[in-house]
């Protein structure tokens, strides 16, 4: 049975003359339709994820495609049980994806070769190919292409510097890169080309498109794909499911992300329900004892209950150390 809601993922690098005016009009349009989601608008284009009913999302796509600027924009469509967002945000930003380069990249002028999923699948297996994940470390940790390089970065803007520091591993290699939907790779692969790397290609449509492709069926992907909405993750490999995520506290296989309950920390952690309970969804003793701890507030824990949990953790830590 077809689900009543859908999630749309899309982007388009195209000049938008007055992005602030566009932002205001677009927000009003989304509210009128009843869509929820997060949309970024800049002078270089649009990048968004929205959720709504089948009717609402159809109307949105139809209206967008009627605008010559977005006539050929590709929408990746996921069925959903309900909304994937709580609110609607349309924000004006300087860049669609933040790289802060001195010499900016226009993907309409310079970008890596686009590979369809079947081509990407084949080239990934070439021994002279290096596959670079263009996402953040916490996205990689939940799932990635088998054998892909994990840049040690917490934000996309850190990627060029990481590449500069690890240039040796790329010398003489064919470079493949990928991200969730393709918007980051358009710029990143273009930056690689401008740096003088000659054989640079990107996964057209990103991981989301790869997972839906009827030919490759998500093969050679391990784990889940992190997404920036209420779903947190979506499956990719339809042939086999290999769990690569590891619980923050015990290292056991796990694919469940939570945020540290200390709001000033908010660290993303892969964590089982049992360990969320045991450690009060907090990454450290400092976060567990923080007076603003959200887990304590959500569960209306008394001081005695908190101290009992802390004592249990301390007892186990001592036992493990002996």
UniProtKB/Swiss-Prot annotation:
Q: Which GO BP terms sit in this record?
A: tRNA modification
What InterPro entries does the record point to?
Answer: Rhodanese-like_dom, Rhodanese-like_dom_sf, Rhodanese_C, TrhO, TRHO_N
Matching PROSITE patterns: RHODANESE_3 (PS50206)
Record-annotated active site: 179 (cysteine persulfide intermediate)
Recorded catalytic reaction(s): these are: uridine(34) in tRNA + AH2 + O2 = 5-hydroxyuridine(34) in tRNA + A + H2O
The yes or no answer to whether the keyword Ribonucleoprotein is present is: no
Q: Is Transport there in the keyword field?
A: no
- Which EC number(s) are documented for this chain? 1.14.-.-
Q: Which domain of life is it from?
A: Bacteria
Give the residues annotated as coiled coil.
Answer: none
The residues covered by the Rhodanese domain are 125-219
Q: Name one GO molecular function term.
A: oxidoreductase activity, acting on paired donors, with incorporation or reduction of molecular oxygen
Keywords in alphabetical order, please.
Oxidoreductase, tRNA processing
Against NCBIfam families, the record matches this protein to: PRK00142.1-3
**What is the protein's known function?**
Catalyzes oxygen-dependent 5-hydroxyuridine (ho5U) modification at position 34 in tRNAs.
Q: Can you tell me which family this protein belongs to?
A: Belongs to the TrhO family.
Protein name, entry field: tRNA uridine(34) hydroxylase
Origin organism is Bacillus subtilis (strain 168)
